[in-house]
């Protein structure tokens, strides 16, 4: 918890303060995620005054030094070293400058702002960094929240009417403080300073979204909305935005419906009736490739067409001597004198009628022929005379104008390639070259090319028969022949589709391929993760069975009841039997593992395979690299180092300083850093339990499960944060009283605990809140279900948000929401890591944790977040920390949540398989890419800080200023922001992590299991899923804009997130379309195969997942129940959620005594007076505390005295249980 030293104020290396050398406070110069530090040329030599021998002497030292710049580049992008004579030149780079511009939209903007205030200069000599002195360089000040340096200034927020922060106005009017020679702060007179003015809401131009929502809801003016129960502007704005979102959802649904049903009908249209050749029945007759229905026709009176007895003309199909049913009559209506004019000429002695222009009356004999091409050329029987060729104007008008074709005759390519035929294709038309044989050479003359093409024995005919000759006949002469053939020997068209129909099929098959690929890839990658990837995160052994099937059966039995305890397996690793795992490993090693050449403290711990073990805060402290001789983080390789607290302010090097007072005499001793009972280095972990209105039974269940996990108690601490003085519905005690009843051996008597101020996540006067800190050890109670031999000693801290005295008489005093509870701890961790100014509450948290754990809070690098109604499986914490330690790139993970009340009602029954699929299919697939989009707040884990690069370098993750700043946003105005911050804060934290660190991983650990109770009433489920669905939609909207996620284009997490977003929005339409397809497939014939196959795959693959992953066969039954409830999941719940977009309350869940369900949001009332909140660094708080108490580091008040030897506190001798053969 230290910052590097500012230049020009350093002391000798062996005299540096122990407090400023935390390994977590260093950052690599080339750290990608921090932006890095740049070298400073011509840096001055580092000198500083001599440090006093005691703390009382040290405060008299005045170090009036100026802070040199952090880097050559200032936050605004301008060089700090470039003078007038030194122009700024831009170097060549493959990266565009706007990519490196750190503006307010940059994901690391706030981190750079904090890094800019770090007092450090990078080393240009290769030596260790020079750190700020603990005694002399810290300014002594009694400044409140609105005074002092900018590094600890309150988080700036947007201001709205009724939410004025006095700090902003006061800061603008206060003069800059001057420091006198005596070291005191001299301020100018404030007599003439103007009082702070109220900051009104600034008028901003309407955005495109606001204009769109206003257009959509133009029919609902403000006065009508006031009459309908929406009097405030915020309610009206939320309702208008809701209607805007609903309109967009309806548009998307309409687009999906159009693509599903209307696109094909639009672009392809109703297909024209088509008849395949040789399938034209007897009621039709073919003319030039078109079938005409002549079954009810009558030929008008003409020569050779006698009238029937009924006075009507004969039917040409049945009444004539030659039956023409189903035949081709193209020669009866020949297309003459068109493109064939000049090619087909009159022969000598021909009796074909002609005129002066050379036009011919007919080309072929006016006879019919069979459609299959089997008719032979008849050269003996005379054909009909001219009247059979229909050469009169009346007959041609009757055919071309009055007669309508019934269907086109088409040929398939198999028909065209039939060797018995002589067919070719030109421009989609089928031409029968055998019809060229019907030319009578005595009547007409034809070109030799015609004779060559019709001859099956010619080379040309063999080359073109059965093929498409469109491209081949592009020459001028052949093209002329082909166009002539289209008029005289066309017998049909090739079996083709229109461009629209082709486009429709392309869209259909592309969508099919996309859906199948997404569904298939998700399934197979989920299987790969379950079988292979997740196993590399598992520890070598835990307290539970290592057999996978046996363990799954044990978990299923355990999850049947929320209060059922797991089976205890004898002989396995257990936190109550120290050294049980070490005994076998120690005896198995016959040869010595160290020698006189081994490094002291074992800084280079390696696994059995020779690979370097992962870095943790505890493991790195065994190395002296980059640590000053008297570093507070220099721990010995034994258990004594955890509670060793000598005088921090003596002039001689001693072990690290602690808070004034004492370290609890019952602190859990720290094991040696190389003690690895589970096969990986242990990491210190905080277990955060957020409580609101839960009762004693629920909280006891959660804390019992955490306290009895097999992870060593020396490396875990329970932190319970009670969100206000709340009494749950039907409870006799308030939640804070319940939590305090589970705490014993208090470091400070409960009646002596005072409330301390902090900045809450709220608006107006509620930004000032107060809370009490209680520290001690977990109390299992007199009637505990946990056996006495398993009741371990676990350090515990309870934070009770009690509110300010002004709200003591109001309902829910101190209540600020779950996000505020999380921010209390997250902001505290950020202040600890960056050594920033902290509030009084955070100072008490720091000291309280140190007293009950024996180590600095800076040691904690992992945080487990659990709701107060969740029970954790005994080895779950071990599995989760194992994954964190083995893969430093993992920044967040979650386990599987089981349902404990499966059989309470039909409402709980339909949720069982939904929980299973969401974990083992969705989260397993996302884990392959390290991009789990939702870490459930009821059971998840985040990394506070991560080791980076070389030894002793750490970067903030959850404690990153960008995470804390965005997550603690106190002014939410738009509907989108309210759904993010007020309904789905847990999911939004996951989104923030992915958005800030897109290259790091968030995974699912299936071995880590918890169980919880789910809603057993439909209205409660409806309210819960309304919050979850709306939160999911708005978080996916945020994630879809993150461009740096894994993959590219369609093969990326960004694309998968987009598909999930669209899929969530169209759920009601999708289930309606599904039922429509199923019903039409049953009624109509043939059924729609492709949609039914897709439906079967989507619904059936999860069942196959149950079989492949070897889970309980009972999940098949739960799957069938889930399928029956699909209309509820996909229609009722989403539709209700969409209509409730503007409802920001928690509905029927978590109701308190006397509470009525109402729409909620951030309430703006009063003004925030920041002067009531004191902000100082830990060193300043500690100095003031010691000044008031008169404690100046006397040897008798600190464990260990002032010498170089140490004495253990009462009841704690050397910790021999970690080594069984010690």
Swiss-Prot record:
* One Pfam family this sequence matches: CHS4
Which reactions is this enzyme annotated as catalysing? [(1->4)-N-acetyl-beta-D-glucosaminyl](n) + UDP-N-acetyl-alpha-D-glucosamine = [(1->4)-N-acetyl-beta-D-glucosaminyl](n+1) + UDP + H(+)
Q: How does it sit in the membrane?
A: Multi-pass membrane protein
Residues bearing carbohydrate:
378, 418, 440, 637, 1030
Positions of transmembrane segments: 205-225, 243-263, 513-533, 1055-1075, 1089-1109, 1113-1133
Reported phenotype of the disruption mutant: Does not affect mycelial growth nor sensitivity to various stresses.
- Domain of life, per UniProt, equals Eukaryota
**Location in or out of the cell:** Cell membrane
Q: Per the UniProt entry, what is one GO biological process?
A: chitin biosynthetic process
For this UniProt record, the keywords arranged alphabetically read as follows: Cell membrane, Glycoprotein, Glycosyltransferase, Membrane, Transferase, Transmembrane, Transmembrane helix, Virulence
InterPro entries reported in the protein's UniProt record: Chitin_synth, CHS4-like_dom, Nucleotide-diphossugar_trans
List the Gene Ontology MF annotations in alphabetical order: chitin synthase activity
Ranges of Basic residues compositional bias? 182-196
Supply the induction statement: Exhibits higher expression levels in hyphae than in germinating conidia. Expression is increased in the absence of chitin synthase CHS2.
Gene Ontology CC: cell septum; plasma membrane
The EC number on file is 2.4.1.16
Q: Where is the composition biased (Polar residues)?
A: 11-24, 42-77, 616-630
Instruction: Supply the PANTHER family for this chain.
Output: CHITIN SYNTHASE, CHITIN SYNTHASE 3
Q: Hey, which family's this protein in?
A: Belongs to the chitin synthase family. Class IV subfamily.
Q: Could you tell me what this protein does?
A: Polymerizes chitin, a structural polymer of the cell wall and septum, by transferring the sugar moiety of UDP-GlcNAc to the non-reducing end of the growing chitin polymer. Shows additive effects in septum formation with CHS1, CHS2, CHS3A, CHS5, CHS6 and CHS7. Regulates conidiation. Involved in virulence and mediates mycotoxin deoxinivalenol (DON) biosynthesis via the regulation of the expression of TRI4, TRI5 and TRI6.
Q: What is this protein called?
A: Chitin synthase 4
Organism ancestry: Eukaryota, Fungi, Dikarya, Ascomycota, Pezizomycotina
